[in-house]
Every structure is written in structure tokens, then in C-alpha cells.
Amino acid sequence: DEKFSITHVGLMNSDRNPTILWEVLNEISNTNLNFKNDLRIKLIGKLDDAVIQDLKVFDHNTIETIPYLDHKDVGKYQASSQILLLSINEVPSAKGIITGKIFEYLQAKRPILAIGPEDGDAAMILKNTNAGTIVGFKNKTALKATILNLYKDYKDYKEGVLFVKSVNIEQYHRKNITSQLAEVIKKVVS
């Protein structure tokens, strides 16, 4: 994407609605016209009514919603997006949540911006792979700084695409995970 695109793929229900992100993006947009003009939020998948309501603060041309996209086409959106948004459910068990989405995002090799527990399992994966940043559910200051740093990188990198120097992502490829699961099942059965 030529724009500063932030893309989320999949269901975004009420406990996965990153209200803090919408607030921060709106604050930055209201004080930085270049950011406002560059920002694109792409949401692919079913959205809770609360999410739709929260997004009304943005200009119509800032938001792109696609209710359904065939899985084979999702990869194109992920690979072309500047940033992939991973929003962990804000629930008591959030530290242990690892969505399947994180593994698909890793394969896209785009920067991941996650909102969730900074000491959770998803945070550990992002740290081990150098594939992105996780910001706590209520850490508005860190989220704003992260977005502004990503935006600065986007503006500085004139070829138009942000990239990550991820490492060790092969261990999270679905073939490897399936193989590891098969080994566990074999051990349990025998």
C-alpha cells in the first residue's frame, strides 16, 4: 500500500475492539494533517457493532471494511499492508491467548502491532521473532509512541513499504506446528 495502512483480518468482537487504538489514531489525525491524509484502516471480517460505532470518528475514506474475503485473497492484503493489527481479547485469560492470526501475520513478514498483555504468550512470540510490538490494553502513551515511530519509518522509507527483520518465524509455520502436534499425539497414543 502507498498509504499508511493498518490492517486487521478476522472477527473483531466487542472484547477484541481496540478502543484505545481508535482514540490514539483519532488524536494523532486531529493534530497531524499529513498523518490523517496518509492513514488507512482496513478491517477484513465481521465487526461488532461497538467497533463500527467507534470508527465513526474517522473520515469515510480512511476506513475500508470488507465483511468477507476468501482465505486465498487474505494473504494479498496482509502482504501489502504497512502494519498488521493483532488485537488480543481483553479477558482475564488474555496472557495465554495465542490467536491463529499471529501465525499468518508472521508469514506475511509485515510489522505487527499487537494490543494485549505485554507479558503474555503472544508478546513472547513477537519478541522471539522480532516481528512486531505489543502494547498493553491501557498503555495509551506507549501506543501513541509506537504508532508515531512506525509512521516516521513509513515516511522515511520512500519505497513505500515498511518491513521487519523477523527471525525464527519458520518454527511458527503451520506445517511445523502441525508436525509438532502430530508428534505429541503419537506420544500420547503410544
Question: Which residues are covered by each model-predicted region?
Answer:
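Short hydrophobic signal-anchor/transmembrane segments that target glycosyltransferases
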Residues: 19-35
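Nucleotide-activated donor-binding/catalytic signature segment of Leloir-type glycosyltransferases, i.e.
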Residues: 32-45, 49-75
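Conserved donor-binding/catalytic core segment of Leloir-type glycosyltransferases
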Residues: 1-16, 22-25, 177
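A charged, aromatic-enriched C-terminal amphipathic alpha-helix characteristic of glycosyltransferases
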Residues: 138-142, 155, 159-187
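Short hydrophobic beta-strand element within catalytic cores of glycosyltransferases
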Residues: 83-87, 104-116
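Acidic donor-binding loop of glycosyltransferase active sites
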Residues: 60-64, 78-95
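Short alpha-helical segment that forms part of, or immediately flanks, the ligand-binding pocket
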Residues: 75, 100-108, 123-124
